[in-house]
């Protein structure tokens, strides 16, 4: 508002509010409530000065966006195709002696080269930086034997997002026993929870039956069981069930939803962790796994 007001933000806000109120009254002069997605504060103040009651539009938009229309599905599939290619480029670039940033740039560069749009985060870590999770890529130099974690978090095509995660092993050597254990548990969590997904299952039921995270990994587990996806990470964000605490999120998994199931299994003792995640489309009679990128065979993938 300040950047584009010609030096008069209050006046610009007043004019914008007057125009909005006029459009509302053209529909129905009795309208006195407006759901707002995002407005500059001066416009919010100006709208309220007209007597409008403002509310958060997310309550309307997010449930509506959660269920995809058939016309949206080809866009989601095309986005996945472009991101898959970029992940393959990154996996090929993983090698001792390269920095995390150098390897991650191969992922971003390939996405752009195929006219993908952008990556929303820099969640790419190696070695001791894989624990705890949510560390951005850095200038750390990859070493042989490192675990290397990627979360795609990409806007792949025409505004539609792709969100899956893979963990790779750097170098040509075998993994350690601890690395195989962490990977095996992360894969078990992912597949266990994937088997629960179905149209009609309540969020509460999904969380309650989710893979029981062992005590040694509980403090560093991923913050939710899974979440919706579309134009970004979206509703529903499915929290873990906590014994003795009423489950906070009502609702059910519906056909047309895209759900990303999360897994992170880390070890404070070993100082490393494994991040896996897959993206699923809920259909009328089942579930389709949208992310089919392979798992690292050396760590126990297939």
Model-derived regions, located:
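Active-site neighborhoods and metal-handling regions in enzymes and metal-associated proteins
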Residues: 1-302
């Amino acid at each position: 508002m300040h950047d584009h007001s010609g030096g008069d933000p209050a006046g610009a806000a007043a004019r914008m509010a007057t125009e909005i109120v006029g459009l509302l009254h053209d529909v129905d002069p009795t309208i006195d409530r407006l759901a707002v997605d995002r407005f500059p504060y001066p416009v919010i103040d100006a709208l309220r000065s007209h007597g409008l009651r403002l509310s958060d539009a997310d309550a309307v938009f997010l449930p509506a966006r959660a269920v995809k229309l058939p016309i949206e599905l080809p866009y989601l599939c095309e986005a996945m195709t472009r991101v898959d290619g970029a992940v393959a480029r990154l996996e090929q670039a993983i090698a001792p002696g390269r920095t995390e940033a150098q390897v991650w740039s191969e992922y971003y560069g390939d996405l752009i080269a195929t006219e993908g749009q952008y990556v929303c985060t820099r969640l790419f870590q190696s070695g001791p930086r894989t624990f705890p999770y949510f560390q951005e890529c850095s200038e750390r130099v990859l070493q042989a034997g490192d675990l290397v974690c990627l979360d795609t978090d990409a806007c792949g095509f025409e505004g539609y997002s792709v969100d899956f995660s893979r963990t790779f092993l750097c170098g040509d050597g075998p993994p350690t026993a601890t690395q195989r254990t962490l990977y095996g548990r992360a894969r078990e969590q992912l597949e266990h929870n994937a088997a629960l997904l179905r149209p009609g299952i309540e969020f509460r039921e999904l969380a309650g039956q989710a893979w029981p995270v062992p005590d040694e990994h509980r403090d560093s587990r991923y913050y939710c069981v899974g979440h919706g996806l579309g134009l970004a990470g979206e509703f529903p964000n499915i929290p873990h069930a906590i014994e003795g605490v009423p489950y906070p999120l009502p609702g059910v998994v519906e056909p047309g939803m895209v759900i990303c199931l999360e897994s992170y299994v880390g070890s404070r003792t070993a100082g490393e962790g494994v991040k896996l995640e897959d993206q699923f489309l809920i259909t009328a009679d089942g579930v389709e796994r949208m992310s089919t990128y392979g798992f690292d065979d050396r760590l126990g993938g297939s």
